[in-house]
Amino acid sequence: QQDYGTGWMDF
């Protein structure tokens, strides 16, 4: 799942 808040992947 892409974390669009930080740009990193949300694990």
From Swiss-Prot:
> What are its GO biological-process terms?
defense response; regulation of blood pressure
Q: Which domain of life is it from?
A: Eukaryota
Q: List the disulfide bonds.
A: none
> What Gene Ontology cellular-component terms does the record carry?
extracellular region
Tissue expression, as annotated, is: Expressed by the skin dorsal glands.
- Which key words tag this protein in UniProt? Amidation, Amphibian defense peptide, Hypotensive agent, Pyrrolidone carboxylic acid, Secreted, Sulfation
Is Secreted one of the keywords? yes
Q: Where in the cell is it found?
A: Secreted
> What modifications follow translation?
Isoform 3.1Y4 differs from isoform 3.1 in not being sulfated.
Q: PTM Pyrrolidone carboxylic acid: list the residues.
A: 1
Phenylalanine amide occurs at 11
Q: Which family does it belong to?
A: Belongs to the gastrin/cholecystokinin family.
- What is the purpose of this protein? Hypotensive neuropeptide.
Name the UniProt record assigns to this protein: Caerulein-3.1/3.1Y4
- Supply the source organism for this entry: Ranoidea citropa
